[in-house]
Regions:
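Rossmann-like dinucleotide-binding cores of NAD(P)H-dependent redox enzymes
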Residues: 8, 12-42, 127-173
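Short acidic, glycine/proline-rich loop/turn micro-motifs
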Residues: 18-22, 83-84, 198, 231
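A short N-terminal beta-strand-loop micro-motif at the entrance of redox/enzyme domains
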Residues: 202-212
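Short, conserved active-site loop motifs that form the nucleotide-linked donor/cofactor pocket
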Residues: 45-47, 163-164, 248
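Flexible, membrane-facing loop/turn or short amphipathic-helix motifs
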Residues: 193-204
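Feature captures the FAD/FMN-dependent oxidoreductase FAD-binding
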Residues: 34-84, 173-186, 191-194, 217-219, ...
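Rossmann-like dinucleotide/flavin-binding elements
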Residues: 1-9, 49-60, 77-79, 94-152, ...
Length: 249
C-alpha cells in the first residue's frame, strides 16, 4: 500500500505462520485461511519464498539486498523448565503442529489419559484438541481460575467438552516407568501471595502438599520465548519495535 515491493521468506511450505500451524481446525477453518492467503498470492508486489529457513548467513544477505528487513518470527522457543520431551512428554506447539499440519490424530489415540500443563490459550488449544481424541483430559495450572490468562470463552468451552481443571497446582516431577514412558506427574499445591510484575498474585509452593496424578501423555504449554540469535548474535529489540541493527525492525 505504501509502494514497496515485498519479499516474504518462510520456513514452512505455506502462508499463515502460527495462525495456520497453531490454531486448531475447530476454531478456524483452513478453507477460510486458504482463501485469504490465495488473494495475497495474487498481489504482484509480493513475492513468496517458502521452505526457506533464515540463518545468520542468509540474514546478512537480506540486510545487504533489501532497504528494510522486518523480523516477524514470533516466540518459537518453548519453555520446558528442564524437562526433556519424549516418550509421552510433548511441548504444546509441537503437539499442535503435529495435529494441525501433519494430521497425526490417529497416533495419539494410543494414549488414554492426558494432562496439559499451563493456563494460556495454547494450553486450551492443546486440551481441547486432545479431548477430541482422548476421553480423559485435565489441565494443571499453578494459579487460581481468576488469574488464568486463557480466554474465558476457551475455559467455558473446554469444560463443556469435559476437560477437567486442577487449579493452584504445579508440576514438581514427571513420573516415568522403567522404559522411560510417562506414567504421570507429581504435583505440589500452590498458594497465592503478593502480585508479581504481571499484576497477578504470585504462586508459592505449599511444603508437604505433593501428590501424584496418572497420565500417559503430558503436554507442556507453559509459554514461549523469542530467540533471535539464529539471525544475528547482536540482534536485540529496542523501543518502538526497532532493533539494534540499522534498518531491521
Amino acid at each position: 500500500k505504501n509502494g514497496y515491493t515485498v519479499d516474504i521468506y518462510d520456513k514452512e511450505d505455506r502462508l499463515g505462520g502460527a495462525i495456520y500451524t497453531g490454531i486448531p481446525e475447530y476454531r478456524m477453518s483452513k478453507i477460510f485461511l486458504d482463501k485469504v492467503f490465495a488473494s495475497m498470492k495474487e498481489d504482484k508486489n509480493i513475492t513468496f519464498h517458502f521452505n526457506t529457513k533464515i540463518d545468520c548467513e542468509r540474514f546478512e544477505g537480506l540486510r545487504k539486498n533489501y532497504d528494510k528487513v522486518l523480523v516477524a518470527t514470533g516466540a518459537q522457543i518453548e519453555n520446558t523448565y528442564g524437562f526433556e520431551p519424549g516418550n509421552g512428554l510433548y511441548a504444546g506447539l509441537t503437539l499442535l503442529y503435529d495435529l494441525n499440519i501433519r494430521g497425526n490424530h490417529e497416533y495419539y489415540k494410543k494414549y488414554k489419559k492426558a494432562m496439559v500443563w499451563g493456563g494460556g490459550n495454547v494450553a486450551m488449544d492443546c486440551a481441547r484438541s486432545l479431548v477430541r481424541i482422548i476421553d480423559d483430559v485435565s489441565v494443571v495450572y499453578r494459579r487460581s481460575e481468576e488469574e488464568i490468562t486463557a480466554n474465558k470463552s476457551e475455559i467455558r468451552d473446554a469444560r463443556n467438552e469435559n476437560v477437567k481443571f486442577n487449579f493452584l497446582c504445579n508440576v514438581k516431577r514427571v513420573l516415568r516407568d522403567e522404559s522411560g514412558a510417562v506414567t504421570g506427574a507429581q504435583l505440589i499445591r500452590q498458594e497465592l501471595g503478593e502480585p508479581d510484575s504481571s499484576g497477578r498474585r504470585s504462586p508459592q509452593s505449599v511444603p508437604g502438599s505433593e501428590f501424584n496424578i496418572d497420565a500417559d501423555i503430558i503436554v507442556m504449554a507453559i509459554g514461549q520465548k523469542v530467540d533471535l540469535s539464529e539471525l544475528a548474535e547482536d540482534l536485540k529489540i529496542t523501543e518502538n519495535y526497532r532493533t539494534t541493527l540499522e534498518n531491521v525492525f
